[in-house]
């Protein structure tokens, strides 16, 4: 587990590493879903929705991408992705802190209802439950969570 890392703004040259980190991390979280088959879709969404409309901060060490967070100008956190090797470290906390810094009036997000680990993480980081919904992309049941200062 890495204890030292740097946060910096996303660069176009990070795309392949960010997409592979997304695939690898989500595959581990949901082994029954073939995320390799979704990479082309994700690359398009990454470029056209997230890179185009959100601030993206990456965590890296020695040039290796360890995680990233996306936050748009309305305070919506669409993606918090941290490599499995970093689960339980302070890296995800640092990325959430950066999202809060960029959106000081509040942060909202959707989290899969069956992702107990992520829900506990957000609760520990000051997020509260703000209702239930359905993910517009996957159709999965989700919780709306929010952080307010």
Language-model regions, residue ranges each:
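Conserved N-terminal entry element of GNAT/NAT acetyltransferase domains
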Residues: 1-13, 147
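Conserved GNAT-fold acetyl-CoA-binding loop/helix
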Residues: 15, 19-46
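A short helix-loop-beta-strand connector motif used in the catalytic cores of GNAT acetyltransferases and
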Residues: 45-58, 76
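Conserved beta-strand in the GNAT
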Residues: 58, 64-81
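A short, internal acetyl-CoA/4′-phosphopantetheine-binding micro-motif in the GNAT/acyltransferase core
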Residues: 77-87, 111-112
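Conserved acetyl-CoA-binding loop-helix of GNAT-fold acetyltransferases
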Residues: 82, 88-101, 120-124
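Short glycine/proline-centered loop/turn elements that form peptide/ligand docking sites
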Residues: 92, 96, 114-118, 135-141
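Conserved GNAT acetyl-CoA-binding A-motif
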Residues: 102-114
